[in-house]
């Protein structure tokens, strides 16, 4: 870009940077280039303009043309030669300019600006080209010695990066030129280039301290070394970097083959062609020739130099560990064939540094809990400690298929039950203390289900239920497992029995023998006594039963089919319940009217005293009939007082089952007083009121008094005003026309004869 440097006189100070496409006026007042304290300077003394003469910005040999035009009174001098007023002149770098006749002297210089972009996307390249164009520079794709900057978003080791480091050129971000352009336009201080260095994006060398600034040591890094390339593509790609570093690059093929001593000379580095790489396409005959050279080097104790070591030697500024045929290869970094460049048009590999070294050791992700054992990931892989919990999960995953197979193949019901119980006992983990209350709750719930089952046994099964097709039909494996589990729950969760109940149990067992040797007997005498006591206490716990009825219905429905099957299987062994059930039927008949009254009270809030009296009379009549049928009911009533003392020990959360008929028994229970059928003394029961409207009490009018509203009164006045103004305007025009006609009349006044 062009710069106007003050040489002497009152125009001293910072240089003026000239952007392309902008006219810079040199003058005394209100100018871009202001020269004060010089009386020979005009207000618009001269104009400087820089423009490109070619459209191709890649032509680095063409620089922008800077033209100077003189508009002054006292003249402008270029190299002590006065310019003609009103004419332009092309300037060259190094020309001296004197404005006026005094000491306002300047010098013109051109500062080269050639930016080479690498690894930029399309939008980044477009923004870079626009900024470089305004600054008067060029953008190129391939690195040359004329390049002044390497533009990268993040530093990746490519051929361009190596060449820029060897040449000592700065590597900057694209934002540097954007900020530079803004600073020139606003005449502010230029940005510091150190703050626009891109970060290093090479995982293999990211942890090491790397100096990517311009160092003089890199310019002679390969001095005294000769790099032998056995492949034309490698030579074309890497020869420029070797030459920039002071070395010599030679291409050796089968046609111009040298002697073996040439490859063994000191300072000679044979570049590895990477024939083991599948991406490198080399003919078989050439592979044999290359392999013979590699075998010769190996016999002499030498090694080929990988491509990556050329870049590493430049980055770390040493050839002791890199590019040494007699030394050992570097163990810190793996050297593989690099990937292709993003900016070169040729299909050659540009990137020298590999990605992160691939380790074949597989590491397991840390997905365990905090209590689980942890492990460290270091340079050398260690054994991974697996927690006990994870081992148990693995044991369970192995045992699960065997359990499923046993469930499918077994046909015996006992084996099916054992398998299902085995599935429940598979988790052998130690339970935490927070889970123990839930287990206790499950036990209490099981005991409540057992008590509920005993109450359900109190009622006979309804005859409306569907009968089984076959009495001795084999049960399915799932149902047998459920029966076995329910039996185990009943046996394990039976509640404690009071002493009073135990005495009565012994009394009943002496009077009525029971078959206790049967295997399927699930309901003992204790259950029968508890059902009798529970039935006696139903009237006292009716309110609590209603509140818990909905909650228990969900738990009881699960056991319906199991209980129904058990009732059929245990029919011969439960003959003792026949007598008790007959007595309980009488009690049920006696209590049903009372329960009906209570349920009617809960559902209807507006109960009438007359309906309650009728229900009480029916209840008293039924009680007299029941007294004559059995004596056990009266004994039970006398025992209610004793049972009230033990009401605390009675089971709670029981299920109340009622058998209701769909026929309305008490038709007089409806409230006749709630409906008043006599409308004789009442007025019209309609609550709305007719709204009066204009003309409601008169004859209908098509157009009536208040319906007429002067809607267009305002519009008429405006129209009249407009018409009046128009008439005045027309009259005025008529008067003007008549006056004009009178001016041109020869004899406006006519004389009439008398």
Swiss-Prot record:
Modified how: Phosphorylated by ATM in response of ionizing radiation, and such phosphorylation is responsible intra-S phase checkpoint control and telomere maintenance. Phosphorylated at Ser-432 by CDK2 in S/G2 phases abolishes interaction with TERF2, enabling DCLRE1B/Apollo recruitment to telomeres. Phosphorylation at Ser-432 in response to dysfunctional telomeres promotes non-homologous end joining repair at telomeres, while dephosphorylation by PPP1CA promotes microhomology-mediated end-joining (MMEJ) repair. Ubiquitinated at Lys-435 via 'Lys-6'-linked ubiquitin chains by RNF8, promoting NBN recruitment to DNA double-strand breaks (DSBs). Ubiquitinated at Lys-686 and Lys-689 via 'Lys-63'-linked ubiquitin chains by PELI1: ubiquitination takes place following PELI1 phosphorylation and promotes ATM activation and DNA repair. Ubiquitinated at Lys-735 via 'Lys-63'-linked ubiquitin chains by the SCF(SKP2) complex: ubiquitination takes place following SKP2 phosphorylation and promotes ATM activation and DNA repair.
Biased composition (Polar residues): 328-346, 431-440, 447-462
Residues recorded with modification Phosphoserine: 278, 343, 347, 397, 432, 509, 518, 615, 673
Keywords annotated in UniProt: Cell cycle, Chromosome, DNA damage, DNA repair, Isopeptide bond, Meiosis, Nucleus, Phosphoprotein, Telomere, Ubl conjugation
Single GO BP term: regulation of fibroblast proliferation
Motif (FxF/Y motif): 740-749
Glycyl lysine isopeptide (Lys-Gly) (interchain with G-Cter in ubiquitin) crosslink location in chain: 435, 686, 690, 735
Residue ranges constituting the FHA domain according to the UniProt record: 24-83
PTM annotation (N6-lactoyllysine): residues: 388
Gene Ontology terms for molecular function: chromatin-protein adaptor activity; damaged DNA binding; DNA-binding transcription factor binding; phosphorylation-dependent protein binding; protein serine/threonine kinase activator activity
Pfam family, one: BRCT
Motif (Nuclear localization signal): 461-467
Domain BRCT: 105-181, 224-315
UniProt-annotated stretches for the region Mediates interaction with SP100: 111-328
Main location: nucleus
Segments of this protein annotated with the region Disordered: 326-346, 396-415, 431-475
Function, as annotated: Component of the MRN complex, which plays a central role in double-strand break (DSB) repair, DNA recombination, maintenance of telomere integrity and meiosis. The MRN complex is involved in the repair of DNA double-strand breaks (DSBs) via homologous recombination (HR), an error-free mechanism which primarily occurs during S and G2 phases. The complex (1) mediates the end resection of damaged DNA, which generates proper single-stranded DNA, a key initial steps in HR, and is (2) required for the recruitment of other repair factors and efficient activation of ATM and ATR upon DNA damage.
Free-text note on domains in this protein's UniProt record: The FHA and BRCT domains specifically recognize and bind phosphorylated proteins. The C-terminal domain contains a MRE11-binding site, and this interaction is required for the nuclear localization of the MRN complex.
Family according to the record: Belongs to the Nibrin family.
Full protein name: Nibrin
The gene coding this protein: NBN
């Amino acid at each position: 870009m062009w710069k106007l440097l003050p040489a002497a006189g009152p125009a001293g100070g910072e240089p003026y940077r000239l952007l392309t496409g902008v006219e810079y006026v040199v003058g005394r007042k209100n100018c871009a280039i202001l020269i004060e304290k010089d009386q020979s300077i005009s207000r618009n003394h001269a104009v400087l303009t820089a423009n490109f003469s070619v459209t191709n910005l890649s032509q680095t040999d063409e620089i922008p043309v800077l033209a100077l035009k003189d508009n002054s009174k006292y003249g402008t001098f270029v190299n002590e030669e006065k310019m003609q007023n009103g004419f332009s002149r092309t300037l060259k770098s190094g020309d001296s300019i004197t404005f006026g006749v005094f000491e306002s002297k300047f010098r013109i210089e051109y500062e080269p600006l050639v930016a080479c972009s690498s690894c930029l996307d399309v939008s980044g390249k477009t923004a870079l080209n626009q900024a470089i164009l305004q600054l008067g520079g060029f953008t190129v794709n391939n690195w040359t010695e004329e390049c002044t900057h390497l533009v990268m978003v993040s530093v990746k080791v490519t051929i361009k990066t190596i060449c820029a480091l060897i040449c000592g050129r700065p590597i900057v971000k694209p934002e540097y030129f954007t900020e530079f352009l803004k600073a020139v336009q606003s005449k502010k201080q230029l940005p510091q280039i150190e703050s626009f260095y891109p970060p290093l994006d090479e995982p293999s060398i990211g942890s090491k301290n790397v100096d990517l600034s311009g160092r003089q040591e890199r310019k002679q890094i390969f001095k005294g070394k000769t790099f032998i390339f056995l492949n034309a593509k490698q030579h074309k790609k890497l020869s420029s970097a070797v030459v920039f570093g002071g070395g010599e690059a030679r291409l050796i093929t089968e046609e111009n083959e040298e002697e073996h001593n040439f490859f063994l000379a000191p300072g000679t580095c044979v570049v590895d062609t990477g024939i083991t790489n599948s991406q490198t396409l080399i003919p078989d005959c050439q592979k044999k020739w290359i392999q013979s050279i590699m075998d010769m080097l190996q016999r002499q104790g030498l090694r080929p130099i990988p491509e990556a070591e050329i870049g590493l030697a430049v980055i770390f500024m040493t050839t002791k560990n890199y590019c040494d045929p007699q030394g050992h290869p570097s163990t810190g970094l793996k050297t593989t064939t690099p990937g292709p460049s993003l900016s070169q048009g040729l299909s050659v590999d540009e990137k020298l540094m590999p990605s992160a070294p691939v380790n074949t050791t597989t590491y397991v992700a840390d997905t365990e809990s905090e209590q689980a054992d942890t492990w460290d990931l270091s340079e050398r892989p260690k054994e991974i400690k697996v927690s006990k919990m994870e081992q148990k999960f693995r044991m369970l995953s192995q045992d699960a298929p065997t359990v499923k197979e046993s469930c499918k193949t077994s046909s015996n019901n006992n084996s099916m039950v054992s398998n299902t119980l085995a599935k429940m006992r598979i988790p052998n983990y130690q339970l935490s203390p927070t889970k123990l209350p839930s287990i206790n709750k499950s036990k209490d719930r099981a005991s409540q289900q057992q008590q509920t089952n005993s109450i359900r046994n109190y009622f006979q099964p309804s005859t409306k239920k569907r009968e089984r097709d076959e009495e001795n039909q084999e049960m399915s494996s799932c149902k047998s497992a459920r029966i076995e589990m329910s039996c185990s729950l009943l046996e394990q969760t039976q509640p404690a029995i009071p002493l009073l109940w135990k005495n009565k149990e012994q009394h009943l067992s002496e009077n009525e023998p029971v078959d206790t040797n049967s295997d399927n007997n699930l309901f003992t005498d204790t259950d029968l006594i508890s059902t009798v006591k529970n039935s006696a206490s139903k009237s006292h716990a009716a309110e609590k039963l209603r509140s818990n009825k909905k909650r228990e219905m969900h738990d009881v429905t699960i056991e319906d089919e199991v209980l129904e099957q058990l009732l059929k299987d245990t029919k011969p062994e439960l003959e003792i319940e026949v007598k008790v059930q007959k007595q309980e039927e009488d009690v049920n008949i006696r209590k049903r009217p009372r329960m009906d009254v209570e349920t009617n009270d809960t559902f209807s809030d507006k109960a009438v005293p007359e309906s309650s009296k009728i229900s009480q009379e029916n209840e008293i009549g039924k009680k007299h009939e029941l007294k004559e049928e059995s004596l056990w009911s009266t004994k039970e009533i006398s025992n209610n007082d004793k049972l009230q003392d033990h009401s605390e020990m009675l089971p709670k959360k029981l299920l109340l089952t009622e058998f209701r008929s769909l026929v309305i028994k008490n038709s007089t229970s409806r409230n006749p007083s709630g409906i008043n059928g006599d409308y004789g003394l009442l007025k019209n029961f309609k609550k709305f009121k007719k709204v009066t409207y204009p003309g409601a009490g008169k004859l209908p009018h098509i157009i009536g008094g208040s319906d007429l509203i002067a809607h267009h009164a305002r519009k008429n006045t405006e129209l009249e005003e407009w018409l009046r103004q128009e008439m005045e305007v027309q009259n005025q025009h008529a008067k003007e026309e008549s006056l004009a006609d009178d001016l041109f009349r020869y004899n406006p006044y006519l004389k009439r004869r008398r």
